[in-house]
Amino acid sequence: MSKNPLYTNEIATAHQFVIAHNTDIKLQNFLHDMRFRKDLMHSDRWSLCYDFLKENYPAATDSIVTGLAYYLED
């Protein structure tokens, strides 16, 4: 997980979201693909997470998006 202490709650929320949806193949494939995208800046990673979550999980909050973007950076 990201070492940024400012986003600890967001990262924890995103982690719980991932656990709650652990059987969703689309989410698992997205997470797998994003893990290998080391070329992305945080803002690009955030945008990709936002687009994916809003398309597949319209109720996902910006807190989940932010947490997921930081969660995937490490």
Regions found by a protein language model. Give the residues of each.
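N-terminal acidic leader/helix
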Residues: 2-30
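Short intrinsically disordered terminal tails
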Residues: 1-6, 70-74
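Acidic, low-complexity, intrinsically disordered interaction modules
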Residues: 20-73
